[in-house]
Structure formats: structure tokens, C-alpha cells
């Protein structure tokens, strides 16, 4: 689905901001859009180490913190599946009921910042995959949300 959206609107996309970049599964699709900056936000240690393979690309910027509606350290509940793919700042509730194979037995303290406080990060395409924390991320954009033309989010209707 994401690839179709990027293909359809790539002429209008002037930069990508991905919050919850994980290990960079979408980066190759982003790179098909020429002459844009790609900002990847990932605070979790294990996936971040894999994501760093893109550090050598001059148009890819890796930010080692999360985004939200505050500037502080928060607890990130780490899932035990696929390098923490379901990890979340929000304490799991129904997730473990609908996905009993996913366990949250660990956490990390991560840095979270408001996007509105960041400088020199431009893009009109926002991709969110933050396990229920989307509204807090959007609130942290404040007036900079007006610079976005596209918001793509992965969501679950179960929780």
C-alpha cells in the first residue's frame, strides 16, 4: 500500500519524515523518490543499530530519539518479536490478548522530543508507525503540522 501511495504522489513529495522507522523496511521505497531528504526517527537500541546501515547516504538522516508531545525521557515497552516490532511507549493493554505470541518483558528509557522544537528537518510526507502513540506525535508538531501534505499511519483497529 505504501509503495502505491509513494508512486502516485512522488512528484509532490519534497521530503519524508518517518517516525518509528524500526530497521528501515521502507527506506528502499523512499529512495526511489529522487532529490529528497529522508528523516528516520527510531529510539529503540536494537533496531537502531540495524538502521544505521543507511548512515552513509547523504540524504538520509537518522534521529536516535522518538517524537511525542513532550521533551523528556519515557519508558518504551519492548516486545520480544522481530527486533521489537510492536514496542510502544504505551503500556500494552489488549495487544497481548489479540496477539498472545507477543510478550513485553522488557523496557528501555528513551528520549522523546516535540517535532516543533526541532530545526532543519523538512518534509511534507509523514509516516507514523508508533503503536498507538500517533496522536501524541501529531500534537508535538504544533504549527509545523501545516507543512505536511501527506500523513500515512499504520494502525490496528483492535486496540
Predicted region positions:
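Phosphate/nucleotide-binding beta-alpha loop and adjacent structural elements of enzyme active sites
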Residues: 1-159
Amino acid at each position: 500500500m505504501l509503495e502505491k501511495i509513494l508512486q502516485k504522489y512522488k512528484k509532490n513529495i519534497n521530503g519524508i519524515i518517518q517516525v518509528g522507522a524500526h530497521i528501515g523496511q521502507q527506506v528502499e521505497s523512499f529512495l526511489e523518490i529522487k532529490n529528497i531528504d529522508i528523516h528516520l526517527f527510531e529510539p529503540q537500541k536494537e533496531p537502531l543499530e540495524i538502521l544505521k546501515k543507511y548512515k552513509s547516504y547523504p540524504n538520509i538522516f537518522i534521529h536516535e530519539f522518538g517524537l511525542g508531545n513532550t521533551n523528556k525521557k519515557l519508558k518504551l515497552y519492548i516486545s520480544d518479536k522481530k527486533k521489537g516490532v510492536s514496542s510502544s511507549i504505551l503500556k500494552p493493554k489488549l495487544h497481548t490478548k489479540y496477539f498472545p505470541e507477543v510478550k513485553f518483558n522488557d523496557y528501555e528509557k528513551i528520549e522523546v522530543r516535540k517535532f516543533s522544537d526541532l530545526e532543519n528537518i523538512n518534509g511534507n510526507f509523514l509516516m507514523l508507525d508508533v503503536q498507538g502513540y500517533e496522536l501524541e506525535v501529531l500534537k508535538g508538531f504544533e504549527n509545523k503540522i501545516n507543512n505536511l501534505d501527506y500523513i500515512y499511519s499504520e494502525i490496528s483497529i483492535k486496540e
